[in-house]
């Protein structure tokens, strides 16, 4: 819809979804995929943020560049971002179950100040995690991981931290 509204090219920060057919279709109608905003030569063109979400600094950078942006963050990802913010405001330290360098993890971790969220990828990470005297700990998960993908990690977290706060359903 953005290409129809604005005409090509429309820039997209990261592949908007992990689905080659969709990405190729968008390229064919004038979408140009970039990793960072500074790769966009014509800042008068709009940019779309992918369904995975982006760190808070990205919309700020777009505003500073005077770029129009469209936030296509998946509603489920936005829910995780809001939950992270609410937990942070309630003085929880947050553990994010996810995969290092996944765009969604980067976006979620970028919602809060550095050090507010620690990434947990494996049961071994749980075993090695040192609680830095946080009074309250909560966990959230990357939305693209299934309950089966995270079950062993969640079980390990609950064993290590019996009072850990679970995500809002």
Predicted feature locations:
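The feature marks the mature, well-folded catalytic cores of soluble enzymes
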Residues: 1-169
């Amino acid at each position: 819809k953005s290409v129809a509204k604005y005409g090509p090219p429309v820039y997209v920060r990261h592949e908007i979804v992990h689905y080659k057919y969709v990405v190729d279709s968008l390229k064919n109608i004038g979408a140009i995929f970039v990793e960072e905003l500074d790769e966009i030569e014509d800042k008068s063109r709009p940019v779309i943020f992918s369904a995975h979400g982006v760190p808070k600094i990205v919309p700020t950078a777009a505003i500073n560049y005077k770029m129009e942006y469209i936030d296509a963050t998946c509603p489920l990802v936005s829910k995780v971002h809001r939950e992270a913010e609410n937990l942070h405001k309630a003085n929880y330290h947050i553990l994010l179950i996810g995969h290092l360098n996944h765009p969604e993890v980067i976006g979620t971790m970028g919602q809060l100040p550095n050090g507010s969220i620690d990434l947990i990828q494996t049961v071994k990470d749980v075993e090695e995690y040192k609680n830095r005297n946080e009074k309250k700990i909560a966990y959230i998960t990357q939305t693209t991981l299934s309950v089966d993908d995270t079950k062993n990690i969640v079980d390990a977290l609950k064993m290590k931290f019996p009072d850990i706060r679970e995500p809002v359903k």
